[in-house]
Amino acid sequence: MPEPAKSAPAPKKGSKKAVTKAQKKDGKKRKRSRKESYSIYVYKVLKQVHPDTGISSKAMGIMNSFVNDIFERIAGEASRLAHYNKRSTITSREIQTAVRLLLPGELAKHAVSEGTKAVTKYTSAK
């Protein structure tokens, strides 16, 4: 006896994927360009910290902008450090130093410890 067809799970709140196709006049389907964002990751972290709290799309836009800004600052500083030391590769050491230079006091300490933890987890999983 065949099993009843299962419906696709409802998309999670906060994950916005541009997979819808725009209809052209001549009947051809055209894929919409994907807009990359950190929204799904921000949402996952929010649920880890405050499981019963939601986030508005405006607040998500602000968070996405914040993550992009911090990413660019850290990448730029790490690039400068690599250039000063005549290195062509940005390693975790450059990233760590860039974080120490950019973030104030206790925030830098926490960021470095979380980053070290993430790198350790990644290398042990390989």
UniProtKB/Swiss-Prot annotation:
Q: Which residues carry this modification: ADP-ribosylserine?
A: 7
As stated in the Swiss-Prot or TrEMBL entry, residues carrying the post-translational modification N6-methylated lysine are: 117
List-wise, which residues carry N6-(beta-hydroxybutyryl)lysine? Answer: 6, 12, 17, 21, 35, 86, 117, 121
Query: Which Pfam family is one of this chain's hits?
Result: Histone
Region feature (Disordered): 1-35
Instruction: Summarize the protein's role.
Output: Core component of nucleosome. Nucleosomes wrap and compact DNA into chromatin, limiting DNA accessibility to the cellular machineries which require DNA as a template. Histones thereby play a central role in transcription regulation, DNA repair, DNA replication and chromosomal stability. DNA accessibility is regulated via a complex set of post-translational modifications of histones, also called histone code, and nucleosome remodeling. Has broad antibacterial activity. May contribute to the formation of the functional antimicrobial barrier of the colonic epithelium, and to the bactericidal activity of amniotic fluid.
What's the protein here called? Histone H2B type 1-J
Q: What is the lineage of its organism?
A: Eukaryota, Metazoa, Chordata, Craniata, Vertebrata
